[in-house]
């Protein structure tokens, strides 16, 4: 009689955890839940955004799309505006397909191909005092995506200041991201967490950072630790709820938030959704727990 052998699922899965010990711009890791995905650099956030050009660091969802108007006077084109390629099938029936661009119809073809496009919902990054952080500022890196938990663990130093970050996505029906940062530099206000909201674009980054006047970021509710935002991009909109445990949120500029810690630890969560009620935030620890249960 063959003895029963129970598979240790956690041990089996954990043997495949990806680990990074250096900055690899061609191998960013992602957390998500099938509806929302957050791609991170070695800091567990999107701090080195400018250095990840081939594989952009984005926050994308199944529901987050944007349509860029044709012009200020005209919102969209339709297939009726497109010059089709015509074929006659075996039965003699005339068929029309949008096969290629026709001379004089290029703008219509390109617009229909590019719209709607996925939207980068938010960029989450670390900032050193009033300066951006570059790869040269970061040393001593180790990052591991624990597949069984769905949590990304990152350890590194910024200008010789040790940092530990946990990154996760709610995995039980909510589109919420969570970040937990520990560093002595937080208490000294040297490091802060910054959230940036871009306009949409049809390229691989899904972001246009040059069109500040073409979208709106409106504060609907605010306190030291919580903020509810209404994001409007032309005819598209979504909501973002931010919860900063152990910190204070302040708006800097039209589409940027900055979060400072009260001590050496800062937990933030970001709830995203098409409806206002979907942007109701849970704590970062609740999101981490949901990620572990969902694994």
Question: What is each PLM-predicted segment?
Answer:
Residues 2-295:
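Acidic/polar, glycine-enriched structural segments that form the non-catalytic walls/loops
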């Amino acid at each position: 009689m063959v003895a029963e052998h129970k598979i240790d699922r956690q041990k089996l899965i954990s043997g495949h955890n990806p680990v990074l010990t250096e900055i690899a711009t061609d191998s960013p890791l992602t957390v998500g839940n099938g509806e929302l995905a957050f791609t991170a650099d070695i800091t567990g956030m999107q701090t080195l955004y400018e250095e990840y050009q081939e594989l952009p660091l984005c926050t994308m969802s199944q529901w987050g799309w944007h349509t860029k108007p044709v012009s200020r006077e005209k919102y969209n084109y339709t297939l009726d505006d497109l010059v089709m390629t015509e074929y006659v099938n075996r039965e003699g029936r005339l068929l029309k397909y949008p096969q290629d661009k026709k001379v004089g119809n290029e703008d219509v073809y390109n617009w229909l191909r590019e719209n709607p496009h996925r939207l980068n919902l938010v960029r989450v990054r670390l900032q050193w005092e009033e300066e951006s952080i570059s790869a040269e500022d970061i040393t001593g890196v180790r990052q591991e995506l624990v597949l069984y938990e769905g949590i990304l663990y990152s350890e590194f130093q910024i200008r010789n200041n040790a940092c530990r970050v946990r990154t996760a996505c709610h995995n039980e029906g909510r589109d919420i991201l969570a970040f937990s940062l520990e560093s002595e530099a937080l208490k000294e206000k040297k490091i802060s967490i910054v959230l940036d909201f871009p306009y949409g674009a049809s390229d691989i980054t899904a972001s246009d950072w040059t069109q500040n006047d073409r979208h709106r970021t409106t504060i609907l509710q605010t306190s030291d630790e919580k903020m509810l935002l209404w994001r409007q991009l032309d005819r598209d909109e979504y909501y973002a709820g931010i919860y900063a445990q152990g910190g204070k949120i302040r708006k800097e500029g039209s589409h940027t938030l900055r979060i400072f810690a009260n001590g050496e630890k800062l937990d933030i969560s970001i709830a995203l959704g098409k409806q206002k009620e979907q942007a109701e935030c849970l704590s970062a620890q609740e999101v981490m727990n949901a990620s572990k249960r969902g694994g």
